[in-house]
Regions:
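Conserved alpha/beta enzyme-core scaffold
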Residues: 1-421
Length: 422
C-alpha cells in the first residue's frame, strides 16, 4: 500500500502511537503523507488533527512536517523539532511532558485514552509473522499491543544484520500482577529479539528505504573537556575511597553535545571494561565500544552522526555482539536503574544554589524539549550528575542562578552539579 493510501486510514481526532526515539526508528513515509492529507482537509474546510505519542523525539520530516501542516492536536512525551516547539509554546499543540519510563504504562493503564492506530517502523517481517525491530525500540511493543489497528513501515535502509540485536521483554504486567524484572547485569538478555503483533490488526504495510536523522555533534570544546575531566577525577576519587567498585558501575549519558563530550573524555580515562545502561547510544558510546574501553552497551535507541552511522553499518557484526536494544520501559525502569547502580550523567538548562535543576523550561515558561529520561535516572541512580557550561548565549546568561525559574529535579534528586568551573 502507498503511504497516501495508508494515511487515509487515520481519521481526524484519534490517538496515534508512532515509533521513534531521539531521531531514530521513526516512520519515514506516513508522517509526510498525513501532513499532506491534513493540508487537503484544511483546504476543503474540514478539521484534521491527530494526537501523536512516540518514544521520544523524532525528526523534522515527522514532527516538523506534522506541526507545519497543523496536523498535531496533542504531542507526547518529548520533542526537539523547532517548528513543533514553536507551536507548543504558542498553545497550538497540547504537549504532555512525561518521564519516559512512565509513557508505556500510562498508555497501558488507559490514563491517556484509547489508541486507534499504531504506525511502527520495522526492518522486516519473519515468515511466522514476527517483526524485526529497527534502530529504536522505544514504546513500540506497547503500541503494537494496545492499538486497534497497526500500520507497518518496512524500512530496508538500516543494516539487515541488526536482526538479533534487540531484547524485547514481554514479562511486564498491570498491578497487582507485576513481578520483579529478572535483569541483574546491564548486559543480560531477558526477552526475545522480535516484536509481536496480531496479524488481524495490521491494516497496511508501507515499504521505505530511508535513513534516520543525521545528528550533528560539535567537537568537544575547552569547556566540555573541563567538565569531562572533573567527572573523571570525581569517579577516580570515589573509586580510591572505596565508594565505587574497581570494575565501575554501568553508565547512563543523556543526549547532546556536552553529554557526548563527557563520553569522549572517558576514552582517555583510567576506567576499563565499562558497561552502558542508557536510553540512547550516541557517537561517544560507539567510540568507547570500538576502542575496547566499554565491553557492552544497553539502550533503547541508536542515534548517530553520519560518519558514526557509516562505521556502525560497516562493522555491524562487531556491534551486534556488543549492543542490546530494549523497550524504553526497561531501559529507563527505576527498578533496574537502582538495582544496577547506574551512574547517571544528564544535561540541564540551569541549576540553582539550593541544588534544584531545570531541564525543560527556558525562563520558566518556554518549553525546550522535555524532561526525557533524566528523572528516571537521576532519582534512582547510584550517582547523579547534572552537567552544563556555567553560562549560555555567549556569556549573557548564567546557568547557575539564585532560584530556578522551573524545577524538574529537586535538591533531593540531585547529587553532583558540574560546570567547566568544577
Amino acid at each position: 500500500m502507498t503511504a497516501e493510501q495508508a494515511a487515509a486510514l487515520i481519521p481526524h481526532g484519534v490517538n496515534v502511537g508512532m515509533s521513534g526515539f531521539t531521531g531514530a526508528g521513526y516512520p519515514k513515509a506516513l508522517p509526510q503523507a498525513i501532513a499532506q492529507h491534513a493540508k487537503s482537509e484544511h483546504a476543503a474546510g474540514r478539521p484534521y488533527k491527530i494526537n501523536v505519542w512516540t518514544g521520544a523525539s523524532t525528526a523534522a520530516e515527522m514532527d516538523g512536517a506534522l506541526a507545519e501542516a497543523g496536523a498535531l492536536g496533542q504531542r507526547l512525551p518529548f520533542n526537539t523539532d523547532p517548528t513543533c516547539r514553536a507551536r507548543i509554546n504558542a498553545g497550538e499543540i497540547d504537549f504532555i511532558d512525561m518521564h519516559l519510563s512512565h509513557v508505556a504504562q500510562h498508555a497501558w493503564f488507559g490514563f491517556l485514552g484509547p489508541m486507534s492506530v499504531a504506525v511502527v517502523e520495522v526492518l522486516g517481517v519473519t515468515e511466522d509473522g514476527r517483526l524485526i525491530p529497527s534502530t529504536a525500540v522505544g514504546n513500540n511493543k506497547t503500541w503494537l499491543e494496545i492499538a486497534d489497528k497497526v500500520i507497518l513501515e518496512v524500512n530496508t535502509k538500516p543494516p539487515a544484520k541488526m536482526e538479533g540485536m534487540h531484547d524485547i521483554y514481554y514479562g511486564t504486567a498491570i498491578p497487582p500482577r507485576r513481578v520483579p524484572i529478572a535483569l541483574t547485569h546491564a548486559d543480560d538478555r531477558i526477552g526475545e529479539p522480535y516484536l509481536r503483533v496480531d496479524p488481524a490488526k495490521v491494516v497496511a504495510v508501507v515499504e521505505t528505504h530511508k535513513g534516520d536523522r543525521d545528528n550533528v555533534f560539535a567537537q568537544p570544546d575547552a569547556n566540555s573537556n573541563l567538565i569531562a575531566a572533573s567527572i573523571i577525577d570525581f569517579l577516580a576519587h570515589e573509586m580510591k575511597m572505596g565508594r565505587l567498585p574497581k570494575e565501575m558501575l554501568p553508565i547512563q549519558s543523556g543526549v547532546g553535545n556536552v553529554a557526548n563530550a563527557v563520553l569522549a573524555g572517558l576514552l582517555t580515562g583510567p576506567f576499563e571494561n565499562l558497561l552502558g545502561f542508557t536510553e540512547v547510544l550516541q557517537d561517544g558510546m560507539l567510540d568507547l565500544l570500538r576502542a575496547g574501553k566499554m565491553s557492552r552497551a544497553s539502550a533503547t535507541s541508536i542515534s548517530l552522526s553520519g560518519s558514526a552511522y557509516r562505521d556502525f553499518e560497516e562493522n555491524i557484526d562487531f556491534y551486534r555482539e556488543r549492543i542490546i536494544l530494549r523497550p524504553q520501559e526497561i531501559s529507563n525502569h527505576p527498578e533496574l536503574v537502582r538495582r544496577l547502580g547506574v551512574i547517571a550523567m544528564n544535561s540541564m538548562i540551569e541549576a540553582d544554589i539550593y541544588g534544584n535543576i531545570n531541564s525543560t523550561h527556558v525562563m520558566g515558561t518556554g518549553m525546550m524539549n522535555g524532561i526525557g529520561g533524566s528523572g528516571d535516572f537521576a532519582r534512582n541512580g547510584y550517582l547523579s550528575f547534572f552537567v552544563t557550561p556555567s553560562v549560555a548565549k555567549g556569556g549573557k546568561i548564567s546557568c547557575i542562578v539564585p532560584m530556578c525559574s522551573h524545577v524538574d529535579h529537586t535538591e533531593h534528586d540531585t547529587q553532583i552539579i558540574v560546570t567547566e568551573q568544577g
